[in-house]
Amino acid sequence: MDERLGELVTERRSPDSAELDRMGTGELVRLMAREEARVPEAVARQAPRMAAAIDAVVERLRAGGRLIYVGAGTAGRVGVLDAVECGPTFGVPPGRVVGVIAGGREAMFDPRESAEDSAEAGASDLDRLCVGPEDAVVGVSASGRTPYTLGAVRRARERGALTVGLSCNPGSRLSDIVDHPLEVVVGPEVLAGSTRLKAGSAQKLVLNMISTISMVRLGKTYGNLMVDVRASNAKLRDRARRIVELATGAPPEEAAAALDRCGGEAKVAIVALLLGVGPDEARRRLAAGSVRAALGEGRRP
């Protein structure tokens, strides 16, 4: 065990929760709510670094590369959670946004705590994905020292990929080996060392921002509407129709009919209705992927 582990911010004992087991339930709720409220502030302090990292990720995605999250334990699960949501939300094809967790798929539901200790396993998992210069790899580790994550990120660098490191400690090992270090320091946890709490919340918030903002930049939205939504169930089909209504001002029946003509693709239906063209012409105009570009509109600089 690393003798310096106890010196990490994420391992320290918070004086505010030193009497945790003696507090009443209401007091505990208020304490945890106060602590969680620190998370957005810590994330906001990294805004300039995050913007630079996201712009670099977008370059890789625009060139056909992948966004790959890698981590162990909570950090790995948060990455998988964000990755799997990108398909239905933004219509990205399988394998474009990937979550890799130490211990494999089983570790999502059954803890494989020892899996994080192998840097070789991290490197091997990246090799299996055939990571290359066109990809962006985001290593996630609250401590910034998890061997599995460090091994994966080092291998990603060796293979020429863009690397981003997300940790919750200042001056972490992870920060030292990536192109874009993000250090979201949220302070000691209410339950000392339990980084599934504030650190986990911070990781989820940052990954939400990386994926969502990247998709916005790639034209996967029109305004704040998810126009590339994959209408794969009743709820999402209804949402797609409402999106077409909101974007075009068309009544429900007209929006539904346009969606049917356009194979359920909200983006195509919007362009077809607004420009008065058929589905094929709408798809041609959407070749660059952006509704605004298809309509001849620009975005703010």
From Swiss-Prot:
Active site: 85 (proton donor), 116
Keywords assigned by UniProt, alphabetized: Carbohydrate metabolism, Lyase
GO biological process: amino sugar catabolic process; glucose homeostasis; N-acetylmuramic acid catabolic process; response to fructose
Pathway note: Amino-sugar metabolism; N-acetylmuramate degradation
Keyword Electron transport: no
Note: A lyase-type mechanism (elimination/hydration) is suggested for the cleavage of the lactyl ether bond of MurNAc 6-phosphate, with the formation of an alpha,beta-unsaturated aldehyde intermediate with (E)-stereochemistry, followed by the syn addition of water to give product.
Name this polypeptide is given: N-acetylmuramic acid 6-phosphate etherase
Protein encoded by which gene: murQ
